[in-house]
Every structure is written in C-alpha cells, then in structure tokens.
Amino acid sequence: MYYPFVRKALFQLDPERAHEFTFQQLRRITGTPLEALVRQKVPTKPVTCMGLTFKNPLGLAAGLDKDGECIDALGAMGFGSLEIGTVTPRPQPGNDKPRLFRLVDAEGLINRMGFNNLGVDNLVENVKKAHFDGILGINIGKNKDTPVENGKDDYLICMEKVYAYAGYIAINISSPNTPGLRTLQYGDALDDLLTAIKNKQNDLQAIHHKYVPVAVKIAPDLCEEELIQVADSLLRHNIDGVIATNTTLDRSLVQGMKNCQQTGGLSGRPLQLKSTEIIRRLSQELKGQLPIIGVGGIDSVIAAREKIAAGATLVQIYSGFIFKGPPLIKEIVTHI
C-alpha cells in the first residue's frame, strides 16, 4: 500500500499543515468520481448499537473532520461510522498555533486545538451535501467564550440544529483544551446538563418524528469515585451511549520524549491501556444497560479486540489512522 510513502512526505510537514494539506486533497475528491482513489472494499459486519445498525463496528473518532468537509471521501475508505466535529454554535479560531504535536516514537499526538471550527450552521450545510451510507455522528461542544455555567445552552443550540441530520449526537464534555469544560462531567453540573439534553431530545423527537440517540464522551482521567458517579448519572438520565475516552493529561508513558511537555491532550498508543481500563470499569458499572463506544490508542486488530473484550460494542480510531493510514481500516474491519 502507498500509505507509508504518503506518511513519510506528510511527516516532513508541521502536523497541522499536513492535516490541512491532506484535507485540501480530500475536499477536491469528495463527492466526485475521484473518490475511487481512496475507496476500499471492506467486509460488511453489522452491529446494532443505540438502536442503530452500523455496517461494521469501526468508526472515525471526532476531531479529524471538525466541519464535515470530507464525509464522502472518508466514508469511501470503509468506516462503518464517522463522527464529525466537535462543532460549536458560533465559529471560533481555537487556540494559538502551534497546537498539534507528534510523538513519533510513541505513535502519539498531543493537541490543544481548542475546538477550532467554522460553526454548526456551516457543518449542517456540509452534511446536507454528503451521501455517506454509514452512520453519521455529530459531536457538539460549547464555545470558549460561553461561561461554563451557561454551557448547556450551547449544547442545546447545537442539538436543535443538527438533530435532523445526525445518526447520533455526541456530547463532548471531556476535551482538556476548553477551560472549565471537564467540570461538566461531575455532580450537579452533569445532572443539570443531562436533564436539559434529555428534555431537548424528547422535544426534538416530537418535532422531527424520529429518535436520534445521544452519547456522552468522557475523559480517561476520572478517578474511581468519579467514574462510578458518571456511570450512575448516565443510567439515571437514560442517555443512549457513552464514548470512552477522550485524550489524557497523563504524561507518565511519554516522559523524556520530544514534545512530551507540550500542553494539551495526549492520544495514540500511550493512551491505549488507560482508555481500555476505563472501558472495563465502566462496563462493570453499567452492567450492559448502556453501550460503550471504545476509543483511545487503537492502532491494530489486537488493540481493537482488547477494547471489545473490555466491554465496547463499537470502536473508533484517530491517531492510529494518522500513523497507519487507510490500510488500518480494512485490517481492523476484516479481522475484528
């Protein structure tokens, strides 16, 4: 496969520049016959999760296609689902550059992007043009300048705008790069948010005559007590699924490596065991009452199987996709 050569060229560039260049090319081919250049035939292995039928258990994690610009091209590579976003009510530039760093030896990434996106209205227009035949998840967040105490308003605005177009909606309360965001994972703040989201979901179901499931994306840095509390809240509020996990602030496995001290969330192989352990504990707490979408450091068939053995129904990739390319999709779907 050509990807090792492509990767070598891309890794000569600054990580964000490499991402922009890649997306520039994908935008050119998305929705055109040139999509055949990236199309891969993968086996159909249907999985039911959150009341939806996924054509295979592998999805693209949020953060790669923040604005839904390359849905068809990414879909052609064989993903059973794509999670686009994180998107916010209003466009925002994100944090200052540089804000994305490779840890090449560890096959990890550190990012402090800060929800850079062109806003929810732009994303919806892109979704309307797409023809992806898999499940499309839309990941939503709050604007940086929205006070945390008003954060739920941003989630409700986004829900209202994406509901008609989403296969499922992911609630991102676990990015480490928006000040105060992770506080929404705890106690009364989480209960208030989930109550508002569930009420909005019920209202939107009545308006649109369809039920769009909602999943909450959590951090890997929860202590035991916090994990138990989160699991309890998700069950009490009848949330449809949980995505575990986002990036970590823990640097214990990358000490001494180039870029290891950069501020931001660490993803990729160094996150693998930590996220799998969270999935295992979460699975014990949830007792099969709520499905888990497993994400964090999946870079091989074995790593994907470990997530499923720990309790995940579906899995997602991001950093592994950057390091291994489209062949990883075919490999995982074929052998999982």
UniProtKB/Swiss-Prot annotation:
- Look up the record and name the cofactor or cofactors this protein needs: FMN
Provide one Gene Ontology cellular component. plasma membrane
Ranges annotated as spanning the membrane: none
Q: Where in the cell is it found?
A: Cell membrane
- Which PROSITE patterns would you find in this protein's record? DHODEHASE_1, DHODEHASE_2
Q: Which Pfam families match?
A: DHO_dh
Record text on cofactor binding: Binds 1 FMN per subunit.
EC number in record: 1.3.5.2
Q: Which UniProt keywords apply?
A: Cell membrane, Flavoprotein, FMN, Membrane, Oxidoreductase, Pyrimidine biosynthesis
Q: What pathway is it annotated to? A: Pyrimidine metabolism; UMP biosynthesis via de novo pathway; orotate from (S)-dihydroorotate (quinone route): step 1/1
Q: What class of enzyme is it?
A: oxidoreductase
Q: How does it sit in the membrane?
A: Peripheral membrane protein
Q: Which residues form the active site?
A: S175
Gene3D superfamilies, sorted: Aldolase class I
* GO molecular function list: dihydroorotate dehydrogenase (quinone) activity; dihydroorotate dehydrogenase activity
Tell me the residue numbers annotated for binding FMN.
A62, G63, L64, D65, K66, T86, N139, N172, K217, T245, G268, G297, Y318, S319
The keyword Amino-acid biosynthesis is assigned to this record? no
Q: Set out the biological process GO terms recorded for this chain's protein.
A: 'de novo' pyrimidine nucleobase biosynthetic process; 'de novo' UMP biosynthetic process; pyrimidine ribonucleotide biosynthetic process
Catalytic activity, as annotated? (S)-dihydroorotate + a quinone = orotate + a quinol
**Binding residues for substrate:** K66, N111, R112, M113, G114, F115, N172, N177, N246, T247
Question: What do we know about how this protein assembles, alone or with others?
Answer: Monomer.
Q: Which NCBIfam families match?
A: PRK05286.1-1 (NF003644), PRK05286.1-2 (NF003645), PRK05286.1-4 (NF003646), PRK05286.2-5 (NF003652), pyrD_sub2 (TIGR01036)
The entry's function note states: Catalyzes the conversion of dihydroorotate to orotate with quinone as electron acceptor.
What family does the database annotate? Belongs to the dihydroorotate dehydrogenase family. Type 2 subfamily.
Q: What is this protein called?
A: Dihydroorotate dehydrogenase (quinone)
Q: Organism classification, top ranks?
A: Bacteria, Pseudomonadati, Pseudomonadota, Gammaproteobacteria, Enterobacterales
